[in-house]
Swiss-Prot record:
HAMAP family: Lipid_A_LpxT (MF_01945). It comes from Escherichia coli (strain K12). This is Lipid A 1-diphosphate synthase. It is an enzyme of class 2 (transferase). The gene is lpxT. The keyword DNA damage does not apply. CDD domains: PAP2_like. The chain crosses the membrane at residues 6-26, 63-83, 91-111, 168-188, 195-215.
Length: 237
């Protein structure tokens, strides 16, 4: 019997209900006005403020994606520096299991969710596009934006940090999620619901089976025993 089965099932039900609330209604029901209002709010700001235009352009440049990796790495490094050799090895392996989980859940989400939709910049007409307002390399459109893979990866990182490093680390990771995921919404490369519905659906249905069961701990133990360079065994928390 899985110890946290009631919580896992509850989270799965919430995730499924969230997705169906968006998927079943014609034109996505109450979600579409929310999506449209958020898109047009930020889209109008692009021509009202040059500073905002540049902010959105720069935060959707590929280099900014590298900054998100740096932020995640620095947070994990802050814990790594405090550990001895076995503890440091453990943190590296947690990162490996986190990456493996992110890849698997992202692929499953893309394959199993029966949705393909273009970003709002490719859906609405008579709108402002950063790529047309500035000659700066930036991502302002996507032919298939659902679910939001970038947001999904950052949410998985947040959950792992919470699970293995505590609430404070989890909250800092959530701040990183907001800072690096929502510029995609501001520029129009993603709908708000790509993240709030799409990414969250995959997280609520898939991730509990990794973090609320012994699976993640067993994977960490497996890699600790299998990978070279091991000096001491460690115990999972």
């Amino acid at each position: 019997m899985i110890k946290n089965l009631p919580q896992i099932v509850l989270l799965n039900i919430v995730g499924l209900a969230l997705f169906l609330s968006w998927y079943i209604p014609v034109n996505h029901g109450f979600w579409l006005p929310i999506d449209a209002d958020i898109f047009y709010f930020f889209n109008q700001k692009l021509v009202e403020s040059k500073a905002f235009l540049w902010l959105v352009a720069l935060t959707n440049n590929r280099a900014f994606d590298g900054c998100s990796l740096l932020a995640m790495g620095m947070l994990m490094l802050s814990f790594w520096l405090k550990e001895n050799a076995p503890g440091r090895r453990r943190i590296v392996i947690i990162g490996l299991v986190m990456l493996l989980t992110a890849v698997v859940l992202n692929q499953l989400g893309q394959a199993l969710i029966p949705v393909k939709r273009a970003s709002p910049t490719l859906t609405f007409t008579d709108i402002n596009r950063v790529s047309e307002l500035l000659s700066v390399p930036t991502k302002d459109a996507s032919r298939d934006s659902f679910p939001g893979d970038h947001g999904m990866m950052l949410l998985i990182f947040s959950a792992f940090m919470w699970r293995y490093f505590g609430k404070v680390a989890g909250l800092i990771a959530l701040i990183i999620f907001v800072v690096f995921a929502f510029p995609r919404v501001m520029i129009g490369a993603h709908w708000f619901t790509d993240i709030i519905v799409g990414s969250m659906t995959v997280i609520l249905i898939g991730l509990p089976w990794v973090l609320l069961t012994p699976l993640s701990d067993r994977l960490i133990t497996f890699f600790d025993k299998s990978l070279p360079g091991k000096n001491k065994h460690f115990q999972n928390k």
